[in-house]
């Protein structure tokens, strides 16, 4: 044994030192690490908002530093608003200029963004007054708004005397378009493989369960038409069914009589419960915008809205509200408003109130207005508050509200002439800024309408915190 070991050691010693070193290097050499890559992409998420101001002449005189605000709009995950100052923002200018600013209206810190403000030419010539950051290089980069309430804009946006004799003002109306580009950065990593996941098919599976009636354990009798269903499915979807079925034990197959619903409505209700979708007839139902009185209530979507309220199905309610919202018109809004109030459809009610306020004179002259006054007197004050732009209780109590409502509802040719006085009555002497009718139109995408000859380098632009 010793001689063998000695021989092996001798052989090792006889190896060439260079060969031995090369062999050791190969034995201990680590593989080189793989090369990876990543890409940082900085870009802007753009969105536009159009702000129409009706009643410019009434807006003048509200005071220096006081503004009219647009509705808020969302771009890049933040909310924004346009502030228009009819008498200017800077006391030193003595109301010689109008001011326009873009304000960060939601919580956020150090929001970096680009802006564009356009005062639209209403003559059709397309000579808009445009202040834009998008088409030129910024030496110091995008603007940074530090926190909620920070603003960017112009104290001297336009000389007021020139504005009032220009094509930017038409029919006592101004139109301002704003584009915001929020700066975002993200890492773009290459993905070598991807697997597509199809949309959920659970609705189709439960739908087959409803159609085949497999395992059904309850029967609904609706005006002589029978519907088989499954108590567990109904209970899982509706708290009303849950309390009715799961609190009762030891019962076999049951028959339930439904006396307050038509068969087609109950069928649409089950279709939603099992498939989480509106039945096709409900999606296309419409009162065609020309009806008054109760006809809007006769649509399948309207009746299904009542079923959603009865069985506490908020998602179904929103689906029906979305369908009915598309049918709002001057003639139908009063009835749809009453319907929304009856069935606790808050989103639809809000849209109806806003539409009625923006089209008040035309709505007052419709037969639907009489229907609203006769059948839903409790909605009177709510509509008046919306018209006045008040979020708080009206001062003066109900007597004042009824007095104003009487002035509105008597119709006739004098309604338009009485309009400014009535708004003042509603506000109880509040600031005249509330007497301006504001129409807001949201638009996704850039929505820009530039004229290169009117772009300016905006040396007077200001950033305020």
Curated annotation (Swiss-Prot):
Ubiquitous. It holds the Pfam family MATH_2. CDD domains: BACK_AtBPM-like, BTB_POZ_BPM_plant, MATH. Residues 12-40, 395-429, 441-465 are annotated as: Disordered. It is found in: Cytoplasm. Disulfide bonds: none annotated. Belongs to the Tdpoz family. This is BTB/POZ and MATH domain-containing protein 4.
């Amino acid at each position: 044994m010793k001689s063998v070991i000695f021989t092996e050691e001798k052989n090792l010693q006889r190896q060439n030192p260079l060969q031995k070193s090369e062999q050791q290097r190969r034995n201990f050499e680590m593989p080189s690490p793989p090369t990876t890559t990543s890409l940082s992409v900085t870009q802007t998420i753009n969105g536009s908002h159009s702000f129409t101001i009706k009643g410019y002449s009434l807006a003048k005189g509200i005071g220096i530093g006081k503004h009219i605000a647009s509705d808020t709009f969302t771009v890049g995950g933040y909310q924004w608003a346009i502030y228009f100052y009819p008498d200017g923002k800077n006391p030193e200018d003595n109301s010689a200029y109008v001011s326009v600013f873009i304000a960060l209206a939601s919580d956020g810190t150090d929001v970096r963004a680009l802006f564009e403000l356009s005062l639209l030419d209403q003559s059709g010539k397309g000579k808009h007054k445009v202040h834009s950051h998008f088409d030129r290089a910024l030496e110091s980069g995008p603007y940074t708004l530090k926190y909620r309430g920070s603003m960017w804009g112009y104290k001297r946006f336009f000389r007021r005397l020139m504005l009032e004799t220009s094509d930017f003002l038409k029919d006592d109306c101004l139109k301002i378009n704003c584009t915001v580009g929020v700066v975002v950065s993200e890492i773009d990593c290459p993905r070598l493989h991807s697997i597509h996941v199809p949309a959920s098919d659970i609705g189709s599976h439960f739908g087959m369960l409803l159609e085949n009636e497999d395992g059904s354990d309850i029967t609904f009798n609706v005006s002589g038409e029978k519907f088989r269903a499954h108590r567990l499915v109904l209970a899982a979807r509706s708290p009303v069914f849950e309390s009715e079925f799961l609190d009762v034990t030891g019962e076999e197959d049951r028959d339930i009589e439904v006396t307050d619903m038509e068969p087609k409505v109950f069928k649409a209700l089950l279709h939603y419960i099992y498939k989480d979708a509106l039945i096709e007839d409900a999606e296309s139902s419409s009162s065609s915008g020309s009806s008054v009185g109760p006809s809007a209530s006769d649509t399948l979507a309207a009746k299904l809205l009542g079923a959603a309220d009865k069985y506490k199905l908020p998602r179904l309610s929103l689906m029906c509200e979305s369908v009915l919202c598309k049918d709002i018109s001057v003639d139908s809004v009063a009835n749809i408003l009453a319907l929304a109030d009856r069935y606790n459809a808050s989103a639809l009610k809000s849209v109806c109130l806003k539409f009625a306020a923006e089209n008040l004179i035309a709505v007052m002259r419709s037969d639907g207005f009489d229907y609203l006054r006769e059948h839903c007197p409790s909605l009177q004050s709510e509509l008046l508050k919306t018209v006045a732009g008040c979020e708080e209780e009206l001062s003066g109590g109900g007597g004042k509200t009824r007095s104003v409502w009487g002035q509105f509802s008597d119709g006739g040719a004098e309604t338009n002439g009485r309009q400014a006085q009535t708004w003042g009555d509603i506000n109880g002497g509040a600031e005249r800024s509330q007497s301006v009718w504001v129409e807001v139109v949201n638009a996704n995408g850039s929505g820009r309408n530039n004229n290169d000859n009117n772009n300016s380098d905006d040396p007077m632009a200001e950033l305020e915190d």
